[in-house]
């Protein structure tokens, strides 16, 4: 199974992804910042972002086919790219939209062209809910 955490920087994607990883067996975590470091991708244009997302999609699909659970934490702002991946994998992926109204110091990194999901996703507002409760909501679905 692939658990794809999407949302603005500072919403809690990586925190929740790490917590979910601890609850699942045979799980690999792919983080967007790590991918950028490994592949030296400092291109934050739409094209650069799309390439980083496509890379995460290919790696997560590969690992999933090998029997791993995969947890991805990545802004992944483009709805069309996420929807296409969900259509391809059908029941093998769960999109998790993480958002908050809290100010957490990463507002300068917000992606102006972020497109929230509109269908077939788990909605997690981290403003007033504990990490444990967020993870319980994800696991129960």
Model-predicted segments: where are they?
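Walker A (P-loop) ATP-phosphate-binding motif of ABC ATPase nucleotide-binding domains
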Residues: 2
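Hydrophobic anchor at the beta1->P-loop junction of P-loop NTPases
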Residues: 5
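The conserved Walker
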Residues: 9
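Walker A/P-loop
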Residues: 14
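Conserved substrate/cofactor phosphate-moiety recognition/catalytic segment
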Residues: 17-61, 65
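Amphipathic alpha-helical transducer elements in NTP-driven molecular machines
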Residues: 46-57, 79-82, 117, 128, ...
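Conserved phosphate-donor/acceptor-positioning beta-strand/loop module used by diverse small-molecule
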Residues: 71-77, 88-104, 124
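Small-molecule kinase domains that catalyze NTP-dependent phosphoryl transfer to phosphate-bearing small molecules
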Residues: 98-141
